[in-house]
Amino acid sequence: MTYALLNKIDAPADLRKLDRRELRTLADELRAYVLESVSQTGGHLSSNLGTVELTIALHYVFNTPDDRLVWDVGHQSYPHKILTGRRERMGTLRQWGGISGFPRRSESEYDTFGTAHSSTSISAALGMALGARTLGEKRVSVAVIGDGAMTAGMAFEALNNAGVYKDLPLVVVLNDNDMSISPPVGALNRHLARLLSGQFYAATKKGIEKVLSVAPPVLEFAKRFEEHAKGMMVPATLFEEFGFNYIGPIDGHDLNSLVPTLQNIRERALEGAGPQFLHVVTKKGQGYKLAEADPILYHGPGKFNPAEGIRPAAKPARKTYTQVFGDWLCDMAAADKRLVGITPAMREGSGMVEFERRFPDRYYDVGIAEQHAVTFAGGLACEGLKPVVAIYSTFLQRGYDQLIHDVALQNLPVVFALDRAGLVGADGATHAGAYDIAYLRCIPNMMVMTPSDENECRQLLTTAFHQACPSAVRYPRGSGPGAAIAAELTTVPVGKGVMRREGGARAGHRVGFLAFGSMVHPALGAAEALDAAVADMRFVKPLDVELVKRLAAENDYLVTVEEGSVMGGAGSAVLEALAEAGIDKPVLTLGLPDRFVDHGDPAYLLQQCGLDAAGIERSVRERFGLDQPKVTVASRVA
């Protein structure tokens, strides 16, 4: 496809020069460009195909970047990036040194607020609107938020706060596509569904919008009639109770409705009409039939051929840790009827699809509501159930107070299965599970476990399930080293690591590795060259202090290795144990550095952090002044 119009758009100012009749053609080109780009790099697809017209309309109507535009979550921001000067860089999307898959302030002035976690946009836009008022600047702040993100309490905290300011130029656009990642759940979603299913109300609104598109909504009769229709069909609509002027729902793919409606909203906002709430209805995957039919499959695909679609991949030789967890969850649930599973809107990503199918009455999707998920699990535990919360490491941060106050303080036996622990690759720093060891091990009553392979993951999950205290098992994205997985649900001794390699002193020194989780196997690789001992510590808390003491006694140097923040992490726990025991020993702590690690290929990112086998060996030799191994070349006799 040729991109005759799109190639002329290097900034929204170029977009605003187009005749409105050209926007439909531009939308077709932009949608095709998104599909072409994502098919070549991988990335989020369905959500971006669904926001093409909305993105065009927003930049056409609002004076960005002076008007502030905030994308909630941000995985739907590819059309925005393309229209704001990054079209030619889409080939670098989510790659090392390339553009991010999410809005990033350092990347463009049009990315007014960095996002990636959900439900933050209204708070940020409200802050920007009040900031502009404080500075005496006249502009509109716009938050674009999906219906899935509206299940989080933070969004309603912001709505509640914003409604106080009756003349504030703030606009919230609800992008209602009936999807978060997993289908959204809860009373709010049902409320929106009822809005859409009311035929008389929809017909009445259509008539009102026709009036308002001809004349701005200054006609008192039109305003009264609109309020009357709303009052009859949807009493005291939720968003108006928060102090917003509610408009919609309207078709989010109809530029002839979007543009004039947004123009009226912007005018009213600047005139002091107060916070405005526009409800648009879009379709995930719009314009690409395969994505429309299966928006979950096309939510975040890798590279694929658009003409053929995503082909089923050959069955991998090794299971992912997510699959290991999903299998364990079903097996454990079959063995113990007290088990209940909880996910904050990540059924597919957390490996709970089969569990929901087999145990629907014991499966709880609470929506994008991590705070609620943690305390809800605590309540279930109070009744004698055994809750397992499947959650990405980065998202548990959102429920930290509840973790301390509602679970750990009461010593409730909740299991947290922390997926995506460590680096996550293309999603970058916003999704990396870099901090869970540091923020969990400081909590009293908390047990923290780090499996090094698939079978150990199953064993540690079983061990966690049988504890009478809160516990967390952290495991990385992707597949493990390929360990055979035993069918039995066996436990391991609490607080005990295991030796994986006994060391020697080939070079006149002894090195002992204390490796945690995913770093056990890279440490084993480095240990071969160093003739070092390697302990698979398994537990960060309770730490195997006796094993620490043994390694300290048997080695000249100690090295801790973890795929987590080196500040406050497992290495710090080892140093504390040595200090408590009065042991003075040279220790090198290796882990993720004190910086946010960017997006890119996971193996390359680990290499950049010095956490591959070669990097670990190099760091040990440099830190302790060990000689490089001599390379001998054997002569060949003909």
UniProtKB/Swiss-Prot annotation:
One of its GO terms (molecular function) is thiamine pyrophosphate binding. Thiamine diphosphate binds at residues 75, 116-118, 148-149, 177, 288, 370. Pathway: Metabolic intermediate biosynthesis; 1-deoxy-D-xylulose 5-phosphate biosynthesis; 1-deoxy-D-xylulose 5-phosphate from D-glyceraldehyde 3-phosphate and pyruvate: step 1/1. SUPFAM superfamilies: Thiamin diphosphate-binding fold (THDP-binding) (SSF52518), TK C-terminal domain-like (SSF52922). The keyword Magnesium applies. Its EC number is 2.2.1.7. InterPro entries: Dxylulose-5-P_synthase, THDP-binding, Transketo_C/PFOR_II, Transketolase-like_Pyr-bd, Transketolase_BS, Transketolase_C, Transketolase_CS. Disulfide bonds: none annotated. Pfam families: DXP_synthase_N, Transket_pyr, Transketolase_C. Binds 1 Mg(2+) ion per subunit. Binds 1 thiamine pyrophosphate per subunit. GO terms for cellular component: cytosol. Mg(2+) binds at residues 147, 177. Catalyzes the acyloin condensation reaction between C atoms 2 and 3 of pyruvate and glyceraldehyde 3-phosphate to yield 1-deoxy-D-xylulose-5-phosphate (DXP). Homodimer. This is 1-deoxy-D-xylulose-5-phosphate synthase. It comes from Cupriavidus necator (strain ATCC 17699 / DSM 428 / KCTC 22496 / NCIMB 10442 / H16 / Stanier 337). The gene is dxs.
